[in-house]
């Protein structure tokens, strides 16, 4: 599972990198907005106690919590696992094969291969472009911030950075954060009283948000040119 999510993140990074080469032309000429990485859970948990949660509700919490743990591990990069995994993917050593025995990602990540970027360079650039972190030291783990003035929203920050890179809209933010504190105490949980809605501003050209985590409610009535 971890490798699959990393592959999605690496694909998103390649899109971000390509967009940044000529963002002005993409937006002004073709109305192409900056890309957004989205992970969707099963359903909404708003207004429900733990005992009232349906199977889908619990799956949604589990999905989003797993993604949060993944982001935390990416930012920590313990024993350099992210760099090692990226190198394995680009070198055709990820262990995922086609029926003919060839590497399933042989034709993927073409620009990264053409530029001969190694895992260390790519990881440092992922921290900068996606997580707004200047270095691995700055990143140093995930911080979840309960946005008290934006109901149901949780901001995502990388370590000591002061800019949000992502947002969770799970319905009942307090309930979700309590689960994280109980089951993943290594992840920092904070709150802010006066931050505005990150989700509502996600389509703005100057939005710092690169990652959106949430539930199926986004499928119904929500749209974005960034997806």
What are these regions, as identified by a protein language model?
Residues 214-219:
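Structured mid-domain segments that build the active-site/substrate or prosthetic-cofactor binding neighborhood
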Residues 223-227:
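A short beta-strand element within the Helicase C-terminal
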Residues 20-212:
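Conserved C-terminal RecA-like helicase domain
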């Amino acid at each position: 599972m971890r490798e699959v999510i990393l592959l999605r993140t690496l694909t998103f990074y390649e899109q971000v990198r390509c967009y940044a080469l000529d963002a002005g032309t993409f937006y002004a000429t073709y109305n192409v907005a900056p890309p957004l990485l989205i992970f969707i859970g099963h359903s909404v948990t708003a207004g429900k106690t733990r005992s009232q949660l349906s199977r889908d509700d619990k799956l949604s919490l589990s999905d989003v919590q797993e993604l949060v743990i993944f982001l935390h591990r990416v930012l920590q990069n313990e024993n350099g696992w992210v760099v090692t995994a990226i190198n394995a993917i680009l070198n055709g050593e990820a262990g995922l094969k086609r029926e003919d025995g060839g590497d399933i990602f042989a034709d993927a990540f073409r620009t990264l291969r053409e530029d001969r970027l190694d895992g260390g360079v790519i990881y440092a650039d992922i921290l900068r472009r996606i997580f707004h972190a200047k270095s691995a030291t700055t990143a140093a783990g995930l911080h979840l911030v309960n946005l008290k003035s934006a109901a149901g929203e949780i901001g995502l920050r990388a370590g000591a950075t002061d800019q949000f890179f992502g947002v969770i809209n799970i319905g009942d933010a307090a309930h979700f954060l309590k689960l994280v504190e109980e089951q993943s105490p290594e992840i920092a949980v904070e709150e802010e009283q006066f931050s505005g809605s990150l989700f509502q501003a996600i389509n703005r050209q100057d939005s710092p948000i690169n990652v959106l985590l949430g539930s199926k409610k986004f499928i119904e009535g929500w749209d974005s040119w960034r997806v």
